[in-house]
From Swiss-Prot:
Binding site for Zn(2+): 416, 419, 434, 439
Functional note: DNA ligase that catalyzes the formation of phosphodiester linkages between 5'-phosphoryl and 3'-hydroxyl groups in double-stranded DNA using NAD as a coenzyme and as the energy source for the reaction. It is essential for DNA replication and repair of damaged DNA.
Gene source species: Mesomycoplasma hyopneumoniae (strain 7448) (Mycoplasma hyopneumoniae)
Name assigned to this protein: DNA ligase
UniProt feature coiled coil, ranges: none
Record has Membrane as a keyword: no
Gene behind the chain: ligA
Keyword NAD tagged: yes
Domain BRCT: 611-692
Entry's EC annotation: 6.5.1.2
Length: 692
């Protein structure tokens, strides 16, 4: 009896935990744990409930989060019933589990085939059309009722949410709304409010007009802009009631949706058998880090709709589809220590030392923890077991504790670990900063960034050598690098071995001096760079490569940049108030002004060919499909020719550059009368543009 009461208490504890996680995930767009930790906990609950169902009444079992989808709707949007339940998907973590799922379908239809595509980590949305017009847009909600976010869906680009379609029958389609990774990075959302692209997409899509979320002032400014909706993209994958439209398979339904102008994932396949399914899953797994959107597994569907009714469903998921999850990206290890480091902007990052463990083919001994709130939320405890995950990052991230603890046993760091200055919290309260402009670590990291590959690309100035130069008093700022040539004797003296004093006569024989001469040559070459590289190298908070390139269109040198009215960039080129404020703060700072004064004396010969005014662009390009070179290379060629590049096909697009496996952009271009060109025609256009 005592054992039964303990098991019942454990089940109740797991239910409460999952209910809390569901509320934060579905309603607050603020997931408390990683998906893999959530899935493991849910599976533990399901197993305990199966083995101990007799401990609960039928009503209690039906109320368990293991039997429900989503969470209770708490927003101010209209609550609308779904035409058919918007179910979740059951999960498989191995080939054996996938085979077990497919067995029932093969028993019903021996020639069954399957349809496989990536599982997009976004926000589920159901669209309704009457007489070709979009009339309703429902979120998943609790699976039975959803929120009607039509007012916001209408603001999304037509390419991703068609407002009118060439089809007059009543139609319902379901898909996923997301923000791609490069857009998310350029928006500098980071940990200001949204932890990842999914949270950002949900926050924008579910924004209520008269409701301001409780976030920092900068994020509120960002969220209040109507233009935010242009960042949302989509993939559609479900045609509801396909028999009404005489569609017999998932493969045919995808083609049907594509022909109507809906975005469908081009990375998909109809598979003849499970062997084909397993092979395609392996391909997706290998390529997922190169996709520009997050996926949290693969969806495998029975292709033939004719057996869906016989396959049936539970209250939570259909038996006609399953989500295959990549579990080998998670590992269990011991958290040994946590320590703080300071970046070039003064931001504090918490780092974890862990017991070495093999993850995704490499041995891992450290992991990253974004901020102290992250440590608090996960209730991480030193010298206890934790889960770590690797998802494209070089350093993996701790995503949860193996065991439950009431709170963390690690105290927040209050002083800078390098200069001991008191740390200051950001407006959001999530991040901490060292605001001492003379902090040696901030100075070091600024110079490291200045010399990095995407900035001035001075390979001979790696972090260890910069540390040595700072220690010996040879430099104190990034600009000092350009005057090292005037300090050769001092360099010889301060970097020489005390037991073997170097002189000018024997300097040429020294490998160390040869290395220094190589460094000086690299520094000279760094004077002949694209202007955007120097802008990026300045290390202005929130200004990445994309923003730096755009700024170089409005200013051709430092003097012009310093006198630029940054408010002119508002609502242009994805420049929101956060970036504008960062630019103004940077150029109003006295220490930064001294650095810029120094850099203006260096004698740069900028190679940039970007237009100073985007409106003077001679042509506008979009790209679809796989080309012979990386896409970034074509974007560079387009911009340097004086043309403009856009991710989407719009009425203002002049040319669509077409590669292999092109997506739905080709149909959009044809309908809009946009000229479609291949690579040979593209380079001819670029060549001819230089003659005019």
């Amino acid at each position: 009896m005592k054992k039964n009461s303990q098991i019942r208490a454990k089940i109740i504890e797991l239910r409460e935990k999952i209910e809390k996680w569901n509320h934060h995930y579905y309603q607050l767009q603020n997931p408390l744990v990683d998906d893999l930790v959530y899935d493991k906990t849910l599976r533990e609950l399901e197993k305990l409930e199966r083995e101990n169902f007799f401990l609960f009444s039928l009503e209690e079992l039906n109320q368990s989060p293991s039997q429900k989808v989503g969470s209770k709707i708490t927003s101010k949007f209209e609550k609308v019933a779904h035409s058919s339940p918007m179910l979740s998907l059951n999960k498989a973590y191995s080939n054996e589990e996938l085979e077990k799922w497919a067995k029932k379908a093969r028993e019903i239809l021996k020639t069954v085939t399957f349809f496989v595509e990536p599982k997009i980590d976004g926000i589920a949305l159901s669209l309704f059309y009457q007489n070709g017009n979009l009339i309703k847009a429902l979120t998943r909600g609790d699976g039975v009722f959803g929120e009607n976010v039509l007012v916001n869906a209408l603001k999304i680009n037509d390419e991703f949410i068609p407002k009118k379609i060439n089809y007059l029958e009543d139609l319902e389609v379901r898909g996923e709304i997301y923000i791609d990774n490069s857009t998310f990075a350029s928006l500098q959302l980071e940990t200001k409010k949204f932890k990842n692209p999914r949270n950002a997409a949900s926050g924008i899509l579910r924004r209520y007009k008269n409701h301001k979320p409780k976030i920092d002032a900068k994020s509120i400014k960002f969220l209040e802009e109507e233009s935010d909706f242009r960042y949302l993209k989509s993939f559609f994958y479900t045609l509801v009631n396909p028999e009404k439209h005489k569609i017999n398979s998932q493969f045919d339904s995808i083609n049907f949706l594509r022909n109507l102008g809906f975005q469908v994932n081009p990375f998909q396949k109809k598979c003849s058998d499970l062997k084909d399914v397993f092979n395609f899953i392996s391909i997706i797994k290998q390529k997922r880090d190169f996709l520009n959107y997050n996926i949290d597994g693969v969806v495998v569907k029975v292709n033939e709709f004719s057996i869906y009714e016989k396959l049936g469903s539970t209250s939570k998921f259909p038996h006609s589809a399953i989500a295959f999850k990549f579990e080998d990206d998670i590992a269990k290890t011991k958290l040994l220590a946590i320590f703080a480091t300071i970046g070039r902007t003064g931001k504090v990052t918490y780092n974890a030392k862990i017991e070495p463990v093999t993850l995704a083919g490499s041995k891992i001994s450290s992991a990253i923890l974004p901020n102290y709130s992250y440590i608090e939320n996960l209730k991480l405890n030193l010298n206890t077991e934790v889960y770590i995950k690797k998802a494209g990052e070089i350093i993996p991230q701790i995503i949860g504790s193996v065991h439950n603890y009431p709170k963390t046993n690690f105290s927040i760091v209050k002083n800078c670990p390098k200069c001991n200055s008191e740390l200051v919290n950001s407006e959001s309260g999530l991040d901490q900063f060292c605001q001492n402009q003379f902090c040696p670590e901030i100075i070091l990291q600024k110079i490291v960034h200045f010399c990095s590959k995407n900035a001035l690309n001075i390979e001979s100035l790696a972090q260890k050598r910069i540390e040595k130069f700072l220690e010996k008093g040879l430099i104190s700022s990034a600009c000092d690098i350009f005057y090292l040539k005037d300090k050769l004797e001092l360099i010889y003296e301060r970097l020489s071995n005390k037991n073997q004093l170097l002189t000018k006569q024997n300097a040429s024989q020294s490998m160390q001096i040869k290395s220094i001469m190589k460094l000086l040559n690299e520094v000279e070459r760094a004077k002949n760079i694209d202007f955007y590289r120097l802008i990026f190298g300045l290390g202005i908070r929130n200004v990445g490569l994309k923003a730096a390139k755009i700024l170089s269109r409005y200013a051709s040198n430092l003097s012009e940049l310093r006198n630029l009215d940054f408010n002119l960039l508002k609502n242009q080129h994805d420049f929101g108030p956060v970036i504008i404020e960062s630019l103004i703060d940077y150029f109003n700072n006295q220490k930064n002004s001294e650095q810029l004064n120094c850099l203006e004396t260096v004698g740069f010969n900028f190679k940039t060919t970007f237009l100073t005014n985007q409106s003077n662009s001679w042509a506008s390009f979009a790209i679809s499909g796989k080309l012979s070179k990386p896409r970034d290379e074509y974007v560079r060629i387009i911009e340097e020719s004086g043309a403009s590049f856009h991710e989407s096909v719009t009425k203002k697009t002049d040319f669509l550059l077409l590669g292999q496996s092109a997506g739905s952009k080709i149909e959009k271009a044809k309908k809009a009368g946009i000229k479609i060109i291949n690579e040979v025609q593209f380079f001819d256009l670029i060549k001819n543009s230089k003659k005019t």
